[in-house]
Amino acid sequence: MTEPLSPDQPVTTKDQAPAAPEGFKARHFGDGFVAVNGPLYTRLTEAGMQVGFRVEDRHTNPMRICHGGMLASFGDMLLPMTAHHLCPEAQGRFLPTISLQIDYLSQAPLGSWVQGEAQVMRLTRRMIFMQGLVTADGVNVARVSGIFKIGALFEGPHPLSRHQPG
């Protein structure tokens, strides 16, 4: 477990943040929401895939801890990213969120490494049911679960279709 940065060591940009843990690769998803709130990092494991990010100043609330909205957004990216990796039925498809639940368990301080792992609980012809656990420097900070519709195919290659080791 790494110590969070002290207030006199602010992390205001990704250039000032410590490196991602070993084995994590930066993923880029073009423009839009993920580009503004990322970068996100992924690492393959025997069980599936881990997704993570470093808490920067732009992710925090006035108490200098990761805003709950950012953790919810992270959960809403973690679950379908994992589904794209684990489920052939999801590869290359848009997975709109039908339902997302999050239980906040602790806080993720500025500078902490947040990562999550998820699993598929059930797969039907039209939906994927998932759950995941999010940690900050090894401490459980959120439990997430969601239901995602197996939507239309993306046109052309899509970066979430399959994790490409890099």
Predicted segments with their positions:
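Terminal targeting signals and extreme-terminal segments of soluble enzymes
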Residues: M1-G166
